[in-house]
A protein has these predicted regions:
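Divalent metal-coordination and catalytic microenvironments
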Residues: 21, 74, 179, 260, ...
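Acidic/His-rich, divalent-metal-binding segments that scaffold phosphate/diphosphate chemistry
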Residues: 105-228, 266
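Divalent metal-dependent catalytic cores for phosphoryl transfer on phosphate-bearing substrates
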Residues: 168, 174-175, 185-299
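A short alpha/beta connector and helix-capping loop motif
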Residues: 298-307
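N-terminal intrinsically disordered, cationic/polar leader segments
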Residues: 306-311, 316-318
Length: 318
């Protein structure tokens, strides 16, 4: 069996790569000449990396597409190619190695600790989330938050997104904690602020709860379910919250529901109408965008810049 001798964080320009990696995602892309290639996101315990599968010169676009469709995200595959820096990002390029993507490697012979990227201290996140819930004075609202989270399988394991931010095991819980702490901080920072802190906290704690139902565990990772795009996590989260409305003042419950439905801000179907809803929207964006920017700059050298794959903006490191 091929041993795990190369890790994502060790891949650098011009090196030969031949090692097992988790394939997090496989997307079919079109080349300028009308041909096809596969954009892979690969990972292991050290993080995520990019990989482009070009195939061989005699392969048709249909054959490349067939390989892409057969790849099972979350499984371990042999990645055989060479590294190259393109637009500031180090990528693995695969030609003949496309044959290695026909089937995943058997997981039984691998140590999961070498392949699972899980930077979150979940015990610490649980403790701090509990502290945020404890700040809610209204017992009905506190019970609502606890009941929804406790009845949501995968809340502490699921990622917060497929790629752009907190895209790792425990990412949803970590992002929820960050957004809640930021929202609470905003409520106490702006002068002459009058916000319903209980409603603000509940809305922040539950704003992304629907994402837990949008992913399922596969192999060494999580993959997005059709519900992720067909229904959307906001609607799924709202449905979960509505099942636990008993015991909460109707007006305050409606406000919590508004925060959840409006947390995408001016680009969402429901626009924020209250200071609490705007605070959660800004907190959500701050957590997501800062995580993306931090990840995009993590491997930059001083005075180096590139287009960040996650934040989709040019990033620079001083």
């Amino acid at each position: 069996m091929l041993e795990k001798t190369v890790f994502v964080e060790e891949i650098s320009g011009s090196m030969q790569v031949d090692a097992p990696f988790v394939v997090e995602a496989a997307d079919l892309k079109e080349k300028r000449d009308g041909g096809r290639y596969i954009q892979l996101t690969i990972s292991d315990k050290t993080g995520h990396g990019a990989c482009k599968v070009w195939g061989t010169s005699d392969q048709s676009a249909e054959e490349i597409e067939a390989v892409c469709c057969a790849i099972r995200p979350g499984e371990v595959y042999r990645i055989w190619g060479y590294a190259k820096v393109y637009n500031g990002t180090c990528e693995v390029n695969v030609n003949d190695g496309i044959s290695c993507l026909a089937d995943p490697m058997p997981q039984e012979g691998f140590d999961p600790s070498l392949f699972v990227y899980a930077p979150v201290d979940l015990d610490e996140v649980r403790r701090r989330l509990g502290g945020m819930i404890a700040k809610i004075d209204d017992p009905g609202i506190a019970s609502l938050v606890l009941e929804v989270i406790d009845s949501t399988p995968g809340f502490f394991e699921a990622p917060a997104a497929k790629f752009h931010h907190h895209a790792y095991i425990g990412g949803l819980a970590e992002h929820t904690l960050e957004a809640t702490e930021i929202a609470l901080s905003l409520s106490g920072t702006v002068n002459r602020t009058r916000m319903d802190t209980d409603v603000l906290l509940a809305g922040a704690l539950l704003h992304d709860v629907g994402k837990a139902a949008c992913f399922r565990h596969q192999g060494f990772s999580f993959v997005a379910l059709p519900e992720y795009t067909l229904v959307g996590h906001t609607a799924i989260g709202a449905a979960a919250i509505l099942r636990h409305s008993a015991g909460v003042d109707p007006s305050r419950f409606a406000h919590i529901l508004h925060i959840v439905m409006a947390h995408h801000g001016p680009y969402g179907e429901v626009k924020p109408r209250t200071p609490e809803a705007w605070a959660v929207h800004f907190a959500d964006n701050a957590s997501a965008f800062l995580r993306a920017a931090l990840d995009d700059t993590a491997d930059l050298a001083p005075e180096e810049e590139r287009k960040g794959a996650r934040c989709r903006q040019t990033v620079y490191r001083f």
